[in-house]
């Protein structure tokens, strides 16, 4: 079995954000995000070694194979969610929601203000992430909260807006005060990126809406 490895996407590292300092971004990107990349690659090497992760010894209570597969989900989703998070940040924000996105938000969540309030509530309530995404099965916009990279994820949810709510995302700037960090996050949304994600997500929904017969 070949070893699948990934590389960090350095071009996604944001700088000079409003209310989120470069000093905060530095450990978040270089230590946490890149740490997930490194551990994912390490796990892939071990999974490729049939002697190390002996499938014949797989066990639901404990086995090397089980532990590797669990941590694979944690580290890989840690990579993907961080890339989605960093990739949608721009200094002071950029653009605004497209007419198509605003209409969809109005239909599914009651408007932009209601959507923002829902996202902020999820960002306070959940320990890992708050996500606005498109459900590939229903075609509806949904607010999802995660307690960890791989806990409470909705299968088929395409993320549009992703808020990191782990303390490592704000501790340098705000210590244990999460609300001001969340307010700062909303000041730096690159709506051009979010609009593009929404367009692609809707195309994916149209292609897959009969996926479940």
Curated annotation (Swiss-Prot):
Keyword Transmembrane helix annotated: no
Function text: Destroys superoxide anion radicals which are normally produced within the cells and which are toxic to biological systems.
SUPFAM superfamilies registered for this protein in UniProt: Fe,Mn superoxide dismutase (SOD), C-terminal domain (SSF54719), Fe,Mn superoxide dismutase (SOD), N-terminal domain (SSF46609)
Catalytic reaction equation(s): 2 superoxide + 2 H(+) = H2O2 + O2
Annotated residues for binding of Fe cation: 28, 82, 164, 168
Cofactor comment text: Binds 1 Fe cation per subunit.
Listed name of the protein: Superoxide dismutase [Fe]
A Pfam short name: Sod_Fe_C
Example of a GO MF term: superoxide dismutase activity
InterPro entries, per the entry: Fe/Mn_Superoxide_Dismutase, Mn/Fe_SOD, Mn/Fe_SOD_C, Mn/Fe_SOD_N, Mn/Fe_SOD_N_sf, SOD_C_sf
Subunit structure: Homotetramer.
Cofactor(s) annotated in UniProt: Fe cation
Lineage: Bacteria, Pseudomonadati, Aquificota, Aquificia, Aquificales
Species whose genome carries this gene: Aquifex aeolicus (strain VF5)
Top EC category: oxidoreductase
Keyword Iron set for record: yes
Protein family membership: Belongs to the iron/manganese superoxide dismutase family.
Highest taxon, organism lineage: Bacteria
UniProt EC number: 1.15.1.1
Keyword entries, A-Z: Iron, Metal-binding, Oxidoreductase
């Amino acid at each position: 079995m070949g070893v699948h490895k990934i590389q960090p996407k350095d071009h996604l590292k944001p700088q000079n954000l409003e209310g989120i300092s470069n000093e905060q971004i530095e450990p978040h990107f270089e230590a946490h995000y890149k740490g997930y990349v490194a551990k994912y690659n390490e796990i892939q090497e071990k999974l490729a070694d049939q002697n190390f992760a002996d499938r014949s010894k797989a066990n639901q209570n404990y086995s090397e194979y089980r532990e590797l597969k669990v941590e694979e989900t944690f580290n890989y989703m840690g990579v993907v969610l961080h890339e989605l998070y960093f990739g949608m940040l721009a200094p002071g924000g950029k653009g605004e929601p497209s007419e198509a996105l605003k209409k969809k938000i109005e239909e599914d969540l009651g408007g932009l203000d209601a959507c923002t309030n829902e996202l902020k509530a999820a960002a306070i309530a959940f320990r890992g992430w708050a996500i606005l995404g498109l459900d590939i099965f229903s075609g509806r916009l949904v607010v999802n909260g995660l307690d960890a990279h791989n806990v409470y994820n909705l299968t088929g949810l395409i993320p549009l807006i992703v808020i990191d709510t782990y303390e490592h995302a704000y501790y340098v700037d705000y210590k244990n005060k999460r609300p001001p960090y969340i307010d700062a996050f909303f000041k730096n949304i690159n709506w051009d990126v979010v609009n593009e994600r929404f367009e692609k997500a809707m195309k994916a929904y149209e292609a897959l809406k009969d996926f479940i017969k």
